[in-house]
Amino acid sequence: MFGISCVYGIMFPLRYEEEISYASETYDVDPVFVASVINSESGFNKDVVSSKGAVGLMQLMPSTAEYLAEKLNYGEYDLKLPEDNINLGTYYLSILLEEFKDETLALCSYNAGPTNVHKWLNNEEYSKDGKTLDVIPFNETKNYVDKCQKAMKYYKHKRNYFAIENF
């Protein structure tokens, strides 16, 4: 019989801790936040490619990765390499967190794009104050945010319980 910790270990795997810690420190993003995005985007499968063409652990679109790499003067990269994918994806998360000043909005933007999030914030049907969302209009994005938040809760608990250094 499988125990609850085994089930959680399957639902919320944790790999590439060194790469996550490095990128998180470099771009000042909570590693738990990064791990939750990776879990939700790819389940920590570095080789996954979506039907829309998003690649790797953080499911970056090649055009987005190219833009990010240019901004960073990153040089050559391979989105299937965990180090490159996590560095570029974490840098993108840092941009979204800086722009929106809110983890939920950053997650919405990572999934649905910043243009959609700005439209939602400017629509009283979705946002009463123009700063937070009362309703996430895309079901896919709402489910994505919920999945990331569940993963964050688990990874925060794991970090505190096991006192994982730099994580």
Predicted regions and their residues:
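Export/targeting segments at the very N-terminus of extracytoplasmic proteins
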Residues: M1-K46, E83-D84, R159, N166
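Second-shell loop/turn segments in exported
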Residues: C6-I10, I20-A23, K46-V55, N73-P82, ...
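Surface-exposed patches in mature extracellular/periplasmic domains of secreted proteins
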Residues: F33-A35, Y77, F100-S109, Y161-N166
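Residues that scaffold the ATP/ADP-binding catalytic core of kinase and kinase-like folds
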Residues: D47, Y67-A69, W120
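Substrate-binding/active-site groove segments that recognize
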Residues: K52-L72, L88-Y92, P114
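Non-membrane alpha-helical structural segments and their capping/turn regions in soluble enzymes
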Residues: E83-N87, T104, K142
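Catalytic and substrate-binding regions of cell-wall glycan-acting enzymes that process beta-1,4-linked
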Residues: A106-F162
